[in-house]
From Swiss-Prot:
Record EC number: 3.1.1.11
Note: The PMEI region may act as an autoinhibitory domain and prevent untimely PME activity during transport.
GO cellular component: apoplast; cytoplasm; cytosol; plant-type cell wall
Main location: secreted
Induction: Induced by necrotrophic pathogens such as Pectobacterium carotovorum and Botrytis cinerea.
Expression by tissue: Expressed in roots, cotyledons, hypocotyls, seedlings, leaves, stems, flowers, dry seeds and siliques. Accumulates in etiolated hypocotyls (at protein level).
Organism: Arabidopsis thaliana (Mouse-ear cress)
GO biological process: cell wall modification; defense response to bacterium; defense response to fungus; defense response to Gram-negative bacterium; negative regulation of seed germination; pectin catabolic process; regulation of gene expression; regulation of unidimensional cell growth
Name assigned to this protein: Pectinesterase/pectinesterase inhibitor 3
Residues reported to bind substrate: 356, 386, 454, 498, 500
Summary of the function given for this chain in its UniProt record: Acts in the modification of cell walls via demethylesterification of cell wall pectin. Required for zinc Zn(2+) homeostasis and to monitor Zn(2+) influence on cell wall-controlled growth processes such as root cell elongation. Monitors seed germination and favors root hairs production. Prevents cruciferin seed storage proteins activity, but promotes the expression of genes involved in cell wall organization and remodeling as well as genes involved in lipid and protein metabolism, during post-germinative growth of seedlings. Confers sensitivity to Zn(2+) when overexpressed.
Residues carrying the site annotation Transition state stabilizer: 408
């Protein structure tokens, strides 16, 4: 019996043998098309079963919360053949239809690679970037369906909400990333035009799923908390009536042991923090004294889809290579010998033919990636435009005591949940950018001297949908200038950021801001684009550049005055850090 499309593109089969799966899918699609052509109009008995009135009602109610309700309804109605009894059913049906659309986009890209004449090297690279982001999108959507099957029983409601929103937010980001690869010149834009319709369709389908997920989880959380509040009040009233005093010990959450470590930190995590006594699974040394001579070789030899931490010790030295920690390389840790001693460096850049996405010296995608005591560097100068030192799409990733050094687009916080602590990030234009949910704590963020006529932008956040749980949070950091900029800072305007995408979200809080930052604080991208839809916030900052009296007057900018409002941007809430940061072994703060 011929396999069904669902079987062909099941998560397990897709991951086991992607090329075989996609070939089988192509054959299956041709077979289905042939059968459809023969049987068209033969009998009404073969038509898709229409939705029942009750399913229609559920569908319309669920789609009412989306940004594209007509698409939301028509996609499911056209597919037919499903019984919808809840909003979760509608979300699952919508996501499954989105998977089919993503599969179609895959074949569109493959066809362009094979048949399009005269593709430039960068266009070929951009198309392969699209294949990579399509691969990631398929994984994310399959995982979304699996998580929906478990909802709401296997995790807390907030964990479910965080995971589901992150998966779909990342899927949306991937569509934008594919298209962004064709934005460098006019020739690129012709290829972009061939992809645009399919990519935008998937992005809109994902947007609808995200809106429904947000509506469902927000409602369920509110109902749960209301019930918990009533239960708590009833218990309190009963205790007061009985004149009973209940003592609750919460001090343990912040207790320290005799050596000054938090009591909840395991011995293994303490060793990671101390940076000594950690057993490496592989050692990289340029002089041949380790297991491998290159970082890329060590990563290639690491196990795939591992649930156990795999530590790669990178000895002191300069490693001139480009490294990718792919999606299947999970739980990898890079441990250097010091941020000034272990350096991974490259020079890929847009001017010389790369895409921004592909220019990264190091790209970390496999989930739970950790790095400490390393410098990630791109030596392409300011004249080479976009040249990324580090790109991160790894969920639950963290970086401690690392340097990210480049000029334009230094740190690409691409997608998923990320954390940086005690790091140095230096650059010029948009040097912290992307659409992850990321918190940077206790970091030094330094603008460098750019080319003549350029302006420095610390951030360029890329949120494209108001329901994405993404943004850049800079907390308890120091924002200043490198020595080469400090003496000429008046000649090179420097800003906290500008809106790369329509719903750009950036928060600067509890940080020291030097006078390198101009009084208006923030800059436009172009004209009035995104000024009413962005979310830019400042809270409790200090320093000569922290004054807000002369800040921009955009509708999307606001100075936060209440701690309760700032709390939602902390590591505990914004990236759900309470559930995973302790496992990194790195220092962190969950609150203000």
């Amino acid at each position: 019996m011929a396999p069904s499309m669902k079987e062909i593109f099941s998560k397990d089969n897709f991951k086991k043998n992607k090329k075989l799966v996609l070939l089988s899918a192509a054959v299956a699609l041709l077979f289905v098309a042939a059968v459809a052509g023969i049987s068209a109009g033969a009998s009404k008995a073969n038509e898709k079963r229409t939705l029942s009135p009750s399913s229609h009602a559920v569908l319309r109610s669920s789609c009412s919360s989306t940004r594209y309700p007509e698409l939301c309804i028509s996609a499911v109605v056209t597919a037919g053949g499903v019984e919808l009894t809840s909003q979760k059913d509608v979300i699952e049906a919508s996501v499954n239809l989105t998977i089919t659309a993503v599969e179609h986009n895959y074949f569109t890209v493959k066809k362009l690679i094979k048949k399009r004449k005269g593709l430039t090297p960068r266009e070929k690279t951009a198309l392969h970037d699209c294949l990579e982001t399509i691969d990631e999108t398929l994984d994310e959507l399959h995982e979304t369906v699996e998580d929906l099957h478990l909802y709401p029983t296997k995790k807390t409601l907030r964990e479910h909400a965080g995971d589901l929103k992150t998966l779909i937010s990342s899927a949306i980001t991937n569509q934008e990333t594919c298209l962004d690869g064709f934005s460098h010149d006019d020739a690129d834009k012709q290829v972009r035009k061939a992809l645009l319709k399919g990519q935008i369709h998937v992005e809109h389908m994902c947007s609808n799923a995200l809106a429904m997920i947000k509506n469902m989880t927000d409602t369920d959380i509110a109902n749960f908390e209301q019930k918990a509040k009533i239960t708590s009040n009833n218990r309190k009233l009963k205790e007061e009536n009985q004149e009973t005093t209940v003592a609750v010990d919460i001090a343990g959450a912040g207790e320290l042991d005799s050596e000054g470590w938090p009591t909840w930190l395991s011995a293994g995590d303490r060793r990671l923090l101390q940076g000594s006594g950690v057993k490496a699974d592989a050692t990289v040394a340029a002089d041949g004294s380790g297991t491998f001579k290159t970082v890329a070789a060590a990563v290639a030899a690491a196990p795939e889809n591992s649930n156990k931490r795999y530590v790669i010790h990178i000895k002191a030295g300069v490693y001139r290579e480009n490294v990718e920690v792919a999606k299947k390389k999970k739980n990898i840790m890079f441990m250097g010998d010091g941020r000034t001693r272990t350096i991974i460096t490259g020079s890929r850049n847009v001017v010389d033919g790369s895409t921004t996405f592909h220019s990264a010296t190091v790209a970390a995608v496999g989930e739970r990636f950790l790095a400490r005591d390393i410098t990630f560097q791109n030596t392409a100068g300011p004249s080479k435009h976009q040249a990324v030192a580090l790109r991160v799409g790894s969920d639950f990733s963290a970086f401690y005591n690392c340097d990210m050094l480049a000029y334009q687009d230094t740190l690409y916080v691409h997608s998923n949940r990320q954390f940086f602590v005690k790091c140095l990030i230096a650059g010029t234009v948009d040097f912290i950018f992307g659409n992850a949910a990321v918190v940077l704590q206790d970091c030094d963020i330094h603008a460098r001297r750019p080319n003549s006529g350029q302006k420095n932008m610390v951030t360029a956040q890329g949120r494209t949908d108001p329901n994405q749980n993404t943004g850049i949070v800079i907390q308890k950091c120091r924002i200043g200038a490198t020595s080469d900029l400090q003496s000429v800072k008046g000649s090179f305007p420097t800003y906290l950021g500008r809106p790369w995408k329509e719903y750009s979200q950036t928060v600067i809080m509890q940080s020291a801001i030097s006078d390198v930052i101009r009084p208006e604080g923030w800059s436009e991208w172009t004209g009035t684009f995104a000024l009413n839809t962005l979310t830019y916030r400042e809270y409790s900052n200090t320093g000569a550049g922290a004054g807000t009296a002369n800040r921009v007057k955009w509708r999307g900018f606001k100075v936060i005055t209440a701690a309760a409002e700032a709390q939602k941007y902390t590591a505990g809430q914004f990236i759900g850090g309470g559930g995973w940061l302790s496992s990194t072994g790195f220092p962190f703060s969950l609150g203000l």
